[in-house]
From Swiss-Prot:
ATP binds at L39, G40, R41, G42, K43, F44, A45, V46, V47, K62. It comes from Homo sapiens (Human). It catalyses: L-seryl-[protein] + ATP = O-phospho-L-seryl-[protein] + ADP + H(+); L-threonyl-[protein] + ATP = O-phospho-L-threonyl-[protein] + ADP + H(+). Its EC number is 2.7.11.1. Autophosphorylated. This is Serine/threonine-protein kinase 17B.
């Protein structure tokens, strides 16, 4: 097995199609006003709220550096654009409005998701404010988006609560999947093996350097459901080594104390996804037919007012907790420790609604194999 360095010039699984959306070379500032609201920051990108001068519409401007650690990474950015274009008809994926380019950056003008990350819903402060029916609706929407991607042979590979946004927080809006910087195209001709992702969300096959499949995303959906329902992170340890051990051994707490307010159907759903063998995980399509999700459809058909009132009861608590999202951790476990290291000390108050930085230390120095 040959090994090669993981760099922007030799990453496998990137879409190579030329973007259909025009990449404008005009000055971005001639068309948009940047507000003082910074939505997120990483090592190679920053997202800021902006307003169209012609329409007054709010957007999120994602500034991506074309050179990273001395390497030309324009192909990676074009891949992200291509994935967003491919998914433009899917309402569960963030919409790409325009693209600008200058000498050092490519700027993606994205739909503005005012509700922020669903990570805020994982916080213990909101444990009684988000009902299981709310979680069911969100998980079902995530599955709809992931099913669309998988049907087009795209795996996201960085699904986590920080990369799922809400169109609004009150009433509880619809989800928008963001950050396709780590996504890859999979096919029948080649096997893709890469070490990538955020430590506590890595699937066992990633740690074992086994082939990446759509099942890798399904593992992450299991984690997201677990966090939304229990307000704890299932695998995070005191350090990365302990976290990796928990993942490789699938050490998950299903105790009565942790799952006291979680239904058996929800527990079954999570347990079906958090299994070590990726071939035994259900697909997104199969998950959409799971009894847990179908139960919500049945109840909402006859009692739609319950779902509405559930979302409305969140207003005061959600608004008061929203600003805590960037500073709070889920019982000290839900925070993305690697990402926090990339936020400047003077930006501690910045809301991290977007995550797009490389989650593992020095990922471009890790190894990638493409077996054809």
């Amino acid at each position: 097995m040959s090994r090669r360095r993981f760099d922007c010039r030799s990453i496998s699984g990137l879409l190579t199609t030329t973007p259909q959306i025009p990449i404008k070379m005009e000055n971005f500032n001639n068309f948009y006003i940047l507000t003082s609201k910074e939505l997120g920051r990483g090592k190679f990108a920053v997202v800021r709220q902006c307003i169209s001068k012609s329409t007054g519409q709010e957007y999120a401007a994602k500034f991506l550096k074309k050179r990273r650690r001395g390497q030309d990474c324009r192909a990676e950015i074009l891949h992200e654009i291509a994935v967003l274009e491919l998914a433009k008809s899917c309402p569960r994926v963030i919409n790409l409005h325009e693209v600008y380019e200058n000498t050092s950056e490519i700027i993606l003008i994205l739909e503005y998701a005012a509700g922020g990350e669903i990570f805020s819903l994982c916080l213990p402060e909101l444990a009684e404010m988000v009902s299981e029916n709310d979680v069911i609706r969100l998980i079902k929407q995530i599955l709809e988006g992931v099913y669309y991607l998988h049907q087009n042979n795209i795996v996201h590979l960085d699904l986590k609560p920080q990369n799922i946004l809400l169109s609004s927080i009150y009433p509880l809006g619809d989800i928008k999947i963001v950050d396709f910087g780590m996504s890859r195209k999979i096919g029948h001709a080649c096997e893709l093996r890469e070490i990538m992702g955020t430590p506590e969300y890595l699937a066992p096959e990633i740690l074992n350097y086994d082939p990446i499949t759509t099942a890798t995303d399904m593992w992450n959906i299991g984690i997201i459901a677990y966090m939304l329902l229990t307000h704890t992170s299932p695998f995070v340890g005191e350090d990365n080594q302990e976290t990796y051990l928990n993942i490789s051994q699938v050490n998950v707490d299903y105790s009565e104390e942790t799952f006291s307010s979680v239904s058996q159907l929800a527990t079954d759903f999570i347990q079906s996804l958090l299994v070590k063998n990726p071939e035994k995980r259900p697909t997104a399509e199969i998950c959409l037919s799971h009894s847990w999700l179908q139960q919500w459809d049945f109840e909402n058909l006859f009692h739609p007012e319950e779902t509405s009132s559930s979302s409305q009861t969140q207003d005061h608590s959600v608004r008061s907790s929203e600003d805590k999202t960037s500073k709070s951790s889920c019982n000290g476990t839900c925070g993305d420790r690697e990402d926090k290291e990339n936020i400047p000390e003077d930006s501690s108050m910045v809301s991290k609604r977007f995550r797009f930085d490389d989650s593992l230390p020095n990922p471009h120095e890790l190894v990638s194999d493409l077996l054809c």
